[in-house]
Amino acid sequence: DDICISIKDIEPQAPFHALIIPKKVITRVGEADNEDEPILGHLLITAKKIALEQGLKQGFRIVINNGSDGGETVPHLHVHLLGGRRLTWPPG
């Protein structure tokens, strides 16, 4: 759509693993501004819509990594959408 794109993760951690990426460059959620609030909300609603389209009715997980200790490896905010199996906790 006009705000974000979705792609499949190249190293999936679940049977379904997509990335929802805003078109606006936001380095990480920890650096988002108040003006980015509509974009952040849109990313979550888009993740929910994709999960329903993919038939993830039993549940799904949404993850945002922030900073090196949070597992961030790409300096552009993105949402991980994982599903298709029972996901355990803690994740890693």
Regions found by a protein language model. Name each.
Residues 1-92:
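HIT superfamily nucleotide-processing domains
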